[in-house]
């Protein structure tokens, strides 16, 4: 599973570099703003149904109450589907403002509307992902990620070879987003009858935990997600709003490089959180402390090693032309991207710390 996820993340990292070289700094910034704008509208209205499913379905399964688990999944799917429709409606209303004030180009409004279709394709993806995590189908998740990465890679490489523009790249990412959205839904619908029994969707809502408790959890996670959107996940949008897509392109480049740092740790996030939930539900505190200590040591060691390498050799490796043993001159990013380097060093501080204690992020 980890190998699938690692390959998928590696492909995504390479695609980011290829896309940056194809579009240039400003075009790369516009791409980041459009994708970020749509994603953040969705996050603002998201109740993080995946976390709710992992918590309450996981508890019900641990207590051998499959009917209650089915009621949780059913309710989560309904709520998430409704909020996805609302999110797309809000996006339609906000798209002209986003194009005018953030991208600073009204002609990009159709691009926002186009990529916004991904919100509809992810109508119950969070719920489905939570189901796959609770039922330990990590291989299915990893395989979906790999397929999505390969399809997106093929489309972007085609765009690069044919010298296509921003629209072709955006469509490539949209197709990938639809795969990553619909894939978990299809797989979870396959496994749910086998785990919860046929007719699981008929489980009455009366089996749900206390409505106030569920609503409180959903609202608190939505509030937490909203804070993250404003303070952490909207950096490219803020840069575009206060400066221009050019500066947003520099910032997005720095973020893309940072993603290389956290790439090997990403698989730990989706696999560790369900284990934490199970240990907490069972009160196995010694195992929980041991698990957190182990994953923190692994994440911290990797982060420190990569950070030192970037500080010492980042400018030479990333933004300078260098000649490997095959005799061809290779340059990862053109020199026009060099202003992203100081941003990268600043981001290393915060992301390095967050990367070390990554297990605390979804809680």
Residue map of PLM features:
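Hydrophobic alpha-helical transmembrane segments
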Residues: 33, 109, 113, 143-199
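Alpha-helical transmembrane segments of multi-pass membrane proteins
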Residues: 89, 93, 97-100, 104-128, ...
């Amino acid at each position: 599973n980890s190998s699938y996820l690692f390959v998928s993340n590696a492909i995504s990292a390479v695609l980011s570099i290829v896309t940056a070289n194809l579009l240039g700094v400003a075009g790369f910034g516009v791409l980041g703003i459009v994708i970020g704008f749509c994603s953040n509208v969705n996050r603002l209205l998201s109740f993080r149904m995946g976390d709710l499913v992992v918590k309450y379905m996981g508890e019900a399964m641990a207590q051998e109450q499959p009917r209650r688990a089915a009621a949780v999944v059913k309710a989560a799917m309904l709520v998430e589907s409704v909020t996805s429709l609302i999110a797309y409606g809000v996006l339609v209303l906000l798209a002209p403002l986003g194009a005018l004030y953030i991208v600073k180009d009204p002609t990009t409004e159709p691009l926002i509307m186009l990529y916004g279709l991904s919100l509809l394709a992810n109508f119950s993806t969070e719920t489905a992902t939570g189901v796959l995590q609770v039922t330990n189908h990590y291989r299915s998740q990893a395989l979906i990620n790999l397929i999505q990465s390969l399809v997106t890679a093929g489309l972007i490489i085609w765009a690069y070879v044919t010298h296509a523009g921003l629209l072709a790249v955006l469509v490539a990412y949209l197709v990938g987003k639809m795969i990553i959205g619909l894939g978990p839904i299809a797989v979870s619908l396959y496994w749910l009858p086998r785990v919860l029994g046929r007719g699981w969707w008929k489980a009455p809502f009366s089996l749900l935990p206390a409505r106030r408790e569920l609503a409180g959890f959903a609202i608190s996670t939505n509030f937490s997600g909203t804070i993250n959107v404003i303070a952490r996940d909207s950096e490219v949008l803020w840069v575009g709003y206060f400066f221009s897509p050019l500066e947003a392109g520099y910032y997005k480049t720095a973020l893309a490089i940072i993603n290389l740092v956290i790439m090997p740790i990403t698989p730990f996030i989706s696999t560790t959180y369900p284990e934490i939930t199970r240990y907490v539900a069972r009160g196995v505190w010694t195992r929980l402390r041991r698990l957190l200590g182990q994953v923190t040591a692994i994440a911290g060691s990797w982060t420190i090693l990569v950070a030192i390498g970037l500080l010492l050799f980042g400018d030479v490796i990333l933004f300078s032309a260098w000649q490997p043993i095959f005799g061809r001159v290779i340059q990862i990013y053109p020199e026009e991207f060099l202003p992203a380097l100081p941003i990268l060093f600043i981001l290393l501080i915060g992301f390095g710390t967050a990367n070390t204690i990554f297990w605390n992020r979804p809680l």
